[in-house]
Amino acid sequence: MAHPFRPTFLHSAMMLAAASVLLAGAGGAHLFHRLAPAPQAPHAPKLLLAPMIGVIEPCVLSTADLPASMDDLGPLCRGPQGSAAALVESTLKALQPAARPDAGVELGYTLPVPLLRLFRQGEDGGWRIDDDMVGRLVRTLMDAPRPAILYLFSTHFSSQAPIEETLAADPSNMGQTRDGPLGMDDYYDSKVFNWTFATTRNTLTERRVQAVQAVLDAACRMAPQDRAKIRGVTLLGELHHLFPNFQAGMGFDGPYRVTDYSADSVAGFRRYLRQAFGRIEQLNRVVGADYASFDEVVPPSRDIRFEPLRRYTEHIDAFAQGTLPVSGWAHVEGATARHPAWVHVYRNGDFVGRTAVRWGRQDVLAAKPEFGDANTGWRIDLDFKRLPAGLHRLDVFLEASPGALTHLGTRDIAIMDRQQSTPRLLPQHPLPAATPPGAAVQAHIDSPQPNASYYYNPLVPLWHAFRAQQVVDYLRFFDAQVARSCLRDVPRYTHQIIPFTNPSWDANKFAIQASLRPLDGIRLGVSLYGEPTYGQSYFDWLARSGQSRYGITEFHPLKAMDTAAMQQVFERHARHGAEFLSFFVEPRWQGALVPRGHNMFSFDPDNAQFGSDRLYRSVQRALAPPAR
C-alpha cells in the first residue's frame, strides 16, 4: 500500500506523537487570477503569514485518490497545465474570505519543494528529474496570485522518495558515529535517513544540487511579475548533526554517539585545528596534550568511565565540553508569565544563579493535566571547567513569592581530575533560610543525578565547534546555488530548530549553534513551538544573537489563544524583525477537508489537538475585516 507523502520535522518539547506533515501544492487554474485578491507590492513592510498547506499529495505528486465530490479538483491539479494554485487559493479563502488591506499582516503561503521526490527512475535504472512534477510546482507560483515562500527542502526525515533507499545504500551518504555509518532510524511514524553533510562530494549532495538547479531553472523562466511573488527562499530544512535512537536520544543519558566521524570529517577537524592554532605546540598547551603533529589528533570518542584511553583528550560524554545542566520542573499556584516563580542554585553554600520557571515541558503537562500549563520547566547550565576537583554540593531553592525560598533538594556531584583521584567534599558555607515545600508547590529536580561525576576535556568544545561549522558550511554550499540564480536578490533563510528551548535536550548533540548566528547573505529562519512563540525566552535569545531580521519557518503555541492574543503575538514578532511566519494548515476544497495524512499540528477547525481548532479561528478572525 502506498503511504501518503508525509515528511516530518523535529519540534521543540517532548511530543507524544510525530508530526505528520508536508505541504504546499495542489490545483491551479488561471481563472483564480481574477477571483483571488490582487497581489501586494513586492516586499511590503508587513508580516507575511505564509501557511504551509498540505497540498503536495493530491496535486503535485498526484499520489492521493480524491473523493467523487472533488472530481473537479483533479483536472486542475493533474492536467497538462496542472498546479497546486487552485487548492492553495481555496484553502486560503476559507481562512480569509475577503482581503483586508488595513490588516497588519499579509496572507500568502509557503510552497515546499521535496527535492528528493523530484526524481523518477527510468527503465534503464537511472534517476532523472521528473519535469512534470517540477512544472506543477513552478506553475503553482505562476497561477497563485499571492506572495510565497519557496522552501527547498531535503532533511533527514524521509520524504518517501524512491531514490532515498538507493542513496542510503551508499555509506558515503550516511553520517558516521565512532562505530561506523548510521543506518536508518524511526521518529514515531516517520523514517529517518541519517544523511551526512560532512562532505559535498557524494551522490546525496549531487542529487540535491540537481533538484535545486531544476527548480531554479524553471523558476527563472517565469515572467518577472511571477518571480516577484517569491518573498523568500528557505534552505534544506532542519540541518543538524545526528545520533542513534533519534526519537529518544536527544537528552544527556546513554553512550555518547554523535556524527560525524567519517574520514572526511576527521581530516576536516585536523584542518580546522591547524587553521585555528597554527602550531601543534599551541594546541597542546590549550588542551594539555602531547601530540607530535595535527595528524595525530583524533576526535574525542571514548568514555573514561568505561573504556581505556590512550590520551585523556579522547574522553567524551554529554558534559565533557565543560557545562552540566541543573534542571527540573516546578508548578506554583498563582505564578504567571509576568510574575513567574524562580529557581535559585547554590554550590557549596555559594549562590550560583537563578532562572525563571518558564520552559515548555509537554511531558509534565501530559502527566499532570491539572496544571493546565506546560511552561513548568527550568534549567541553569553550570560551568565547571575551572572548578576545583572534588565533591561539590548543589542545593536548589524555589522562590515562589519575592524573597521566600523553598528548599527543593540537594545533589552531591564529583568534579573529577584527569587522574580520576578519589574526590573529597569541599568546604561548605551556610545556606539561606528556607521553608519546606507546601501544598501549593509541586516540583522535581531532573538533573544532575545524585553522585554523578564530571570530566572536562578541553578538546571537546573544539570538536563541537567544528561540528557546528560543518552545519554552516553545508548551508552555505546550497545558499551559493541560489545566489548564482535569478533569485539571487530574494532573501534566503535557514530553517532551523532551537534545541536549547527544551530543557531536557543536549544542544551539543545537534551542534546547531553556529547556524543560528548572523551569516553573511543568509537570514535566520527558526521553527518555534510552545512558549518561544509567545513568551519571553525567544526574544531574550534574539536580543543576544545579533540577528535583526528573521522568518518563522514553523509556528505553533501548543495551546489555544484568542484573537487578541494571537494578534499580539504577530505584532510582537513583527516589531522584533520577523518577515514571515508559517504554520501548518490542512487543505480544503470548497470548504471540505481534502483526504490525506493529516498533520497533528495543523491549524484546522477540525483539529482539537494542542488547541489547533481555536488557533485557526483566532487567525481567521484576525484576518477578517473589522465588524461594522
Q: What are the residue ranges of the model-derived segments?
A:
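Aromatic-lined substrate-binding rim segments of carbohydrate-active enzymes
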Residues: Q81-Y188, T199-E206, Q210, L216-R221, ...
